[in-house]
């Protein structure tokens, strides 16, 4: 697979272990973004969210923020596989960020943000992301596919919550800023 070929290239580069995998991080980001933006369930939910919010939530803005969240999550998950860092550290830290963001996010968006993590892990994203994790763990020296290859889906579910809450907070901030000028 592509992940295996990129892992072999990284191993032969002679740089710091984590830094040698730059192409794999880019590949992981692109896989995460492209599979999510094409996810049929996300497209449907984004359109319904736009309708239900009387267009306060942009369908495209929601899809892009979820896709960026998945892409960042999968990239960080790929870094975790390469470095061998325990999964729970990232998951606990991520949920602390979610809890803090929830305190400051617009109330209307919180349920949608929490659901966005589940919506993204569907028919398009899961098979490709799972294959990426298993392929990478199989080809990084010292990693076990059984121990290190799984877990990317957890990142793909967690980080969209963070990105959608961030998107809502940015939109809220911009609206408040614009209203102060008027």
Regions found by a protein language model. Give the residues of each.
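Hydrophobic transmembrane alpha-helices of multi-pass solute/ion transporters
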Residues: 1-22, 149
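Short helix-terminus and kink motifs of transmembrane alpha helices
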Residues: 4, 40-47, 164, 173
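Juxtamembrane helix-boundary/capping and inter-helix hinge elements in multi-pass membrane proteins
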Residues: 12, 47-59, 109, 118-121, ...
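Helix-loop-helix junctions within the multi-pass membrane cores of secondary transporters/permeases
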Residues: 21-102
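Hydrophobic cores of alpha-helical transmembrane segments in multi-pass inner/ER membrane proteins
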Residues: 29-32, 127-134, 157-164
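Juxtamembrane and boundary regions of transmembrane helices in multi-pass small-molecule transporters
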Residues: 37, 77-94, 98-113, 147-182
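Hydrophobic alpha-helical transmembrane segments in multi-pass integral membrane proteins
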Residues: 75, 128-143
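C-terminal membrane-solvent junction of multi-pass transporters and transport-like membrane proteins
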Residues: 103-131
């Amino acid at each position: 697979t592509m992940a295996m070929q990129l892992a072999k290239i990284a191993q032969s580069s002679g740089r710091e272990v984590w830094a040698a995998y730059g192409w794999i991080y880019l590949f992981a980001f692109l896989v995460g973004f492209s599979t999510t933006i094409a996810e049929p369930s996300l497209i449907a939910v984004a359109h319904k969210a736009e309708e239900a919010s009387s267009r306060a939530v942009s369908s495209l803005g929601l899809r892009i923020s979820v896709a960026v969240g998945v892409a960042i999550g999968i990239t960080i998950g790929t870094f975790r596989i390469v470095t061998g860092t325990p999964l729970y550290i990232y998951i606990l830290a991520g949920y602390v960020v979610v809890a803090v963001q929830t305190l400051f996010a617009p109330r209307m968006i919180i349920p949608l943000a929490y659901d966005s993590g589940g919506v993204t892990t569907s028919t398009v994203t899961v098979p490709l992301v799972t294959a990426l994790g298993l392929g990478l763990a199989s080809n990084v020296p010292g990693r076990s596919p059984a121990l290190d290859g799984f877990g990317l889906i957890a990142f793909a579910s967690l980080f969209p919550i963070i990105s959608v809450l961030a998107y809502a907070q940015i939109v809220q901030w911009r609206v408040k800023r614009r209203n102060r000028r008027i």
